[in-house]
Amino acid sequence: MIRSMTAYARREIKGEWGSATWEMRSVNQRYLETYFRLPEQFRSLEPVVRERIRSRLTRGKVECTLRYEPDVSAQGELILNEKLAKQLVTAANWVKMQSDEGEINPVDILRWPGVMAAQEQDLDAIAAEILAALDGTLDDFIVARETEGQALKALIEQRLEGVTAEVVKVRSHMPEILQWQRERLVAKLEDAQVQLENNRLEQELVLLAQRIDVAEELDRLEAHVKETYNILKKKEAVGRRLDFMMQEFNRESNTLASKSINAEVTNSAIELKVLIEQMREQIQNIE
């Protein structure tokens, strides 16, 4: 299915440990580039997160952010560092004996850094939940890419219909263009009072017809339209293939324009270039 490289997804999970939020956004990029913003507690997850993203995406500049809010009330049982507390009491008593001033305040002792500590949360268990949420965020992210991709596909198919219409238009004008050019050549020869044998005249007319004949270019344009429709139906990433097809379209439209000797064909060649450029702009967004 066609996917856009531009997308956004957000998913939040909550547990007894607190809450975590994943945010993913991406823009156009020739290859896949990943950027991460992870809290210090889960910085070690970066290789795992990168691998999961790379296993499901192929192109785009992807920014992945994790926000973690621990629940302070769920920090666990407070633990007293008895050894440090005793050292502080001993030191405080010594100071008091030296100055004979002040009283030892137990609360001040407890407030001293490192005396009291909350029991650490099980970060491995939390990480497992966070990674499961990442998979869900990736699901949402891909759905967003596919939704936007279907819109891009519709726009491209609309332009392909325009290309087909221009090909039909040019093909319908070719008999009258060839006849007009034949009459024009004969008239020029008569004005110049040049007499050519019938065989020679026919040879000149054949050469002229070959120079201005665009049937081959029209056939190739029709083939490119058909192939582009087939590519749009594929399930894998097709952005690069579509980009290559636009190069082929451009080549044929340039040749068509160079052979044009009629205003109708010239206008169609210009319209083809416009349609091809519009498709190319949309394809820049496709994975």
From Swiss-Prot:
Pfam families: YicC-like_C, YicC-like_N. Its EC number is 3.1.26.-. One of its GO terms (molecular function) is RNA endonuclease activity, producing 5'-phosphomonoesters. InterPro entries: YicC-like_C, YicC-like_N, YicC/YloC-like. The keyword NADP does not apply. Keywords: Endonuclease, Hydrolase, Nuclease. GO terms for cellular component: cytosol. Disruption phenotype: A double yicC-dniD deletion in rich medium makes filamentous cells with little DNA in stationary phase, has no growth defect in minimal medium, does not grow at 45 degrees Celsius. Slight decrease in suppression of RhyB-silencing of a sodB reporter construct. Its cofactor is a divalent metal cation. GO terms for biological process: RNA catabolic process. The keyword Transferase does not apply. Might interact with PNPase (pnp). Contributes to degradation of small RNA (sRNA) RhyB. Upon overexpression suppresses sRNA-mediated RhyB-silencing of multiple RNA targets but not other sRNA's targets; overexpression leads to loss of RhyB sRNA. Enables degradation of RhyB by 3' to 5' exoribonuclease PNPase (pnp). Endonucleolytically cleaves ssRNA, probably generating a 3'-OH and a 5'-phosphate group. Belongs to the YicC/YloC family. This is Endoribonuclease YicC. It comes from Escherichia coli (strain K12). The gene is yicC.
